[in-house]
């Protein structure tokens, strides 16, 4: 491979879709706002506005997991590479997933120390990290992942209706939980249905993007400084 071709490939792979970063940053801001509301309530400073907090709890997780899926397929599409490099890419995904799980474990330890009555056993970071790892074999199905997504989401909703007494960590990961799960933990995102939402994001990303091109029109957002900041934050977040 000559030097010019290498430079062109690097340039090709470095292109980012700024709208994905904007949605990701918006989700982060809303998540932080939700945590502030929860902290104020937990420490008795101010009671939670149930309407606002409930809305955030419904919207923000979906945004996060959808963007994870979209980001996975978009980055995969940019890899018009040899099998050797493709393997390195999948290896990179697995390593990234384990790093995010590691951050989740740090949060688990932190919660055991500071909120021992309701610690985090399998929260959003654990779920995102594991979802990234097990998404690898699903990336080849591209837009057809909506079939798996629908099945897993429905299965997860069914699991949530089954009360399991004395569940193991495997039960909790899969979504088989005790009836009063929220009295035991402050952050719980089981693999089912949330991995289904990631697969739905992969399907949506395959429909909306082709390689380094959008399949829809969008104004030039990169000329605005806030959008550039979102791009930087998105590039250095848990993509």
Please give the residue ranges for each predicted region.
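Alpha-helical transmembrane segments and their immediate juxtamembrane cytosolic regions
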Residues: 1-239
